[in-house]
């Protein structure tokens, strides 16, 4: 997946600001291009396990989808952080995956972003396959 440096920087900053909790958001790009040029933060509605779980607030998802449509943008995928864990998909992440989207995970170690990886699923619930991350 191609992502603008500014978009990746925003994801990393969001992860650092949200530490030690998981943060989440949506990645957008010009319709049909499959590249990420902008991101939108979303609320994590899993409060009781925010340290190791996330779920995007459905109201944020709808609002961001409407915004993307108005801009003639696609939702390219979703991002979230793993506080003090590697940027690798958990079983929980994989089970909740939808095909057709890219999932970016950023590792935040002691409040600082250290790594990011992308994954795609061929069908609902995975399995996840690695997707190259190209910062351009």
Predicted regions and their residues:
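Conserved, mostly hydrophobic/aromatic
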Residues: 78
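Conserved beta-strand-loop surface patch within small alpha/beta domains used
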Residues: 1-75, 83-136
